[in-house]
Regions:
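Short active-site neighborhood of thiol/selenol oxidoreductases, capturing the structured segment around
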Residues: 49-70
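N-terminal "domain-start" segment that seeds a small globular fold
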Residues: 22-49
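Hydrophobic beta-strand anchors of alpha/beta hydrolase catalytic cores
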Residues: 58-59, 90, 149
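Thiol-/selenol-based redox modules, centered on thioredoxin-like
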Residues: 146-210
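Structural micro-motif
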Residues: 120-123, 140-150
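Bacterial N-terminal signal peptides that target proteins for export
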Residues: 1-15
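Structural microenvironment flanking redox-active thiols in thiol-disulfide oxidoreductases
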Residues: 71-119, 129-134
Length: 210
């Protein structure tokens, strides 16, 4: 996984792949209603997560330069092909520095290259890092890794989210296939905020840097 910076100093360490993730703040509660989120597709068109309401949605927040994100995108493509007809929709959001430049055409090009290089079979766009952190309820005072995964049920409720330091199950094909299949089988049954969910235990992913 890729360790995300909490300061300029840590940012340089991250680039060298030597920073280690340590949670300093509790993760956002799950389940909870999903906030609206907008991403920009390589075409320049903006897409909103709300447009997928009624489907089970998996959102992968990634760095285009992160090998773990690249590997996960291949897993998600397989799941999209298998489960799409049942109402599953995957979405990718790139938010590293390479897609957050003043050059919109350059941002789109980097995102499109990520899609092409990894054979991605689901929509991937880009967004500003502050917007992503706000959506994930991550803080500048904690260290976090990518990819970060959020799974939203048909009613627009977040049912699973990666821990700041990563959740291995949410990057594992066999686990995701079963978990998503269970959510798809629920139909439109909502999850009540504040009640226990069937989300994976917060088992941290192996602390490998890229």
């Amino acid at each position: 996984m890729r360790i995300a910076p909490i300061s300029a100093v840590l940012g340089s360490l991250v680039a060298a792949g030597v920073a280690a993730g340590v949670v300093l703040q509790a993760a956002a509660p799950v389940p909870r209603p999903a906030k609206e989120f907008t991403l920009t597709l390589p075409s320049g068109k903006q897409a909103q997560l709300a447009s997928y309401r009624g489907k089970v949605v998996m959102v992968a927040f990634m760095f285009t330069t992160c090998p773990h994100c690249q590997a996960l995108s291949k897993v998600i493509t397989k799941l999209q092909n298998e489960l799409g007809t049942r109402g599953f929709q995957a979405v990718g959001v790139a938010f590293n520095d390479e897609v957050n430049t003043p050059n919109a055409a350059g941002n789109a090009q980097v995102t499109a290259k990520f899609i092409s290089d990894n054979g991605v079979g689901f929509p991937v766009g880009y967004a500003a890092r502050p917007a992503v952190m706000n959506y994930l309820s991550l803080s500048d005072v904690e260290r976090w890794v990518v990819p970060q995964v959020v799974i939203i049920d048909r009613k627009g409720v977040i049912r699973a989210q990666s821990a700041a330091t990563g959740t291995a199950d949410l990057q594992t094909e066999s686990y995701l296939r079963k978990y998503l299949g269970d959510l798809l089988s629920e139909g439109a049954a909502p999850a009540k905020s504040g009640t226990p969910s069937k989300a994976p235990a917060k088992k941290a992913a192996d602390k490998k840097t890229s």
